């Protein structure tokens, strides 16, 4: 995909008046944007498809007094196949909500934008299992947000941990603890889970898979990220079990 200064993806919409919508866009160069899409709910509106969730395109905006109105859009992708699978659709909406929670207006969001795009593409167009895919997104999302989990050394004593030893994850401290230092509330991890996190931090979305030697601590990573958000995400309740 060729990215331009007008490239963005629709994270949220709210119906407004009889035929309009307020869109929340994520732009890699402009961050989170609130944009009015006039008349988009009319059946023959050229803005109809570009004003739906997941719509990715080049959005031409008219901006006056810090208010943005959508003039036209060149639609690049709709991720339409997500709508055929409720579980994957629920995961996709959760990804959009996480991106919205992290993005700020006027902020460069290139890393977050590409992370969202790559994960949505794998979710839509591959048969990759959704749990490790979402876990990988959460891991890189935390890293992009400045709270990358510490996975090589004990967060208490600082000792480098070996691949074979038992490990616990301290949600408050944001990293691994050794057997001698772990707090009572720390979450025990299997060596395969630690191995998965270390491997997944180094690779792209295609590597976020479970296998015999490594599998994702999905529930742990959800808890780790969600407790750092300013408010709960309602879409989290819709995630499949």
Predicted region positions:
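Non-catalytic alpha-helical scaffolds and adjoining flexible linkers that form interface surfaces
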Residues: 1-22, 26-241
